[in-house]
Amino acid sequence: MLDIRLIRKEPKECESRLQKKDPAISLERLLDLDKTVRQLKADSEALLAKRKVLSGQIHKAKVANENADALIQEVNTIADQLVAFETTLQEQEALLEDLMARLPNYPDEDVPVSPDKTGNQMIKSHGEVPTFPFPPKHHMQLNEALQILDFKLPAKTTGSGWPAYCNEGVLLEWALLTYLLNKQQAHGFQLWLPPLLVKRDILFGSGQIPKFDGQYYRVEDGDRSLFLIPTAEVVLNGFHSQEILNEQDLPLCYAAFTPCFRREAGAGGAHERGLVRVHQFHKVEMFAFTTPEQEEVVYQKMLHVVEEILSELQLPYQLSLLSTGDMSFTAKKTIDAEVWLPGQKAFYEVSSISKCGDFQARRSETRYRDAQGKLHFVNTLNGSGLATPRLLVAILENYQQADGSVVIPSVLRPYMNNQEILLPKTVR
């Protein structure tokens, strides 16, 4: 949520900044509604003041045994006006709040302006894209022999886009997750296994709704609805909603492992088959609450963790600064870490590290008290640390051998009983 006071003070500047993300954004209707709401409040306060004066006059008239019928009639008329004003005010405030809730975060000044991902800037490249002395296989082709993933059986029970891990695929997935969690803990992140279902207001606080309403799996629980989380960012942000934190306790750096649920799987087309885009996947998510002064330090820390993981896995990767048209609704700056997938012949995002400023904190009402006792909104940051499906794809495709086997990265072997290689089922 943005600060309405700044929009009132600098409407043109705010509109210009927002149009970097979406050129169609106009603040004209919002400002008109804001004026209407403020005028209604002023008129209501004037009527309340007038009623108070009249009530005093009625009291004096009664004490003096004077006729107060006209005064009483005027007070009754004011009461009816106040009821009408309150109804109109509630309607106009709801419209204003909805417009405010649909405005994205302002992008930082150093973010490239572009309508889409073509404006993203590659800021770092690490490792060499592998060349194979044989035709490299897509991970789905490798899986035919390895048999570590199953897409047919879960398609019967649930539908397409819901893969199941099996055999050594289960062990490799858990090895990867254990390694990721250990890495987060080593860097001082507090580990969490949070709930997978959240209330609607928690989705609102993280910025998922109302803009993306209807894109989340919903569970009916009696007279209320709960939603399956698309990322642990949602629940971690909600942990301190409507709270006042102490400045000396900041930054709070959390890392959570959760399954994530997204309805848009398959949106990338048939070429993104397999694990590249699915409805349910595992992810370790980093999330932090900071002061504005701590924000950049924690941001660099998150970037460092992601780079360390990809370097230790010995996967070729690049970092891209996202343009305004490719950033999320809540972010003011995002750097994507992308790994090379030979099967796609392209780099694919495995982590997004974002600064959100006080955007989510305003929606969630998360503040901190400084040493002087003043209240401020916290800043929030988030970053995938990391999502495993594409990471697993990257391992399978980059570590594949001519015979269809896959070498297990050395950093994962301690979590797989020191197993060094995945062999095709036919040679096991």
From Swiss-Prot:
Belongs to the class-II aminoacyl-tRNA synthetase family. Type-1 seryl-tRNA synthetase subfamily. Catalyzes the attachment of serine to tRNA(Ser). Is also able to aminoacylate tRNA(Sec) with serine, to form the misacylated tRNA L-seryl-tRNA(Sec), which will be further converted into selenocysteinyl-tRNA(Sec). The lineage of its organism: Bacteria, Pseudomonadati, Chlamydiota, Chlamydiia, Chlamydiales. Its main location: cytoplasm. One of its GO terms (cellular component) is cytoplasm. Consists of two distinct domains, a catalytic core and a N-terminal extension that is involved in tRNA binding. Signal peptide: none annotated. One of its GO terms (biological process) is selenocysteine biosynthetic process. It is found in: Cytoplasm. Homodimer. The tRNA molecule binds across the dimer. NCBIfam families: serS. InterPro entries: aa-tRNA-synt_IIb (IPR002314), aa-tRNA-synth_II (IPR006195), aa-tRNA-synth_II/BPL/LPL (IPR045864), Ser-tRNA-ligase_type_1 (IPR002317), Ser-tRNA-synth_1_N (IPR015866), SerRS_1_N_sf (IPR042103), SerRS_core (IPR033729), tRNA-bd_arm (IPR010978). It is an enzyme of class 6 (ligase). This is Serine--tRNA ligase. It catalyses: tRNA(Ser) + L-serine + ATP = L-seryl-tRNA(Ser) + AMP + diphosphate + H(+); tRNA(Sec) + L-serine + ATP = L-seryl-tRNA(Sec) + AMP + diphosphate + H(+). It comes from Chlamydia trachomatis serovar L2 (strain ATCC VR-902B / DSM 19102 / 434/Bu). ATP binds at residues 262-264, 278, 349-352. Coiled coil: none annotated. L-serine binds at residues 231-233, 285, 384. It comes from the Bacteria. The gene is serS. Gene3D superfamilies: Bira Bifunctional Protein, Domain 2, Serine-tRNA synthetase, tRNA binding domain. Keywords: Aminoacyl-tRNA synthetase, ATP-binding, Cytoplasm, Ligase, Nucleotide-binding, Protein biosynthesis. Pathway: Aminoacyl-tRNA biosynthesis; selenocysteinyl-tRNA(Sec) biosynthesis; L-seryl-tRNA(Sec) from L-serine and tRNA(Sec): step 1/1. GO terms for molecular function: ATP binding; serine-tRNA ligase activity. CDD domains: SerRS_core (cd00770).
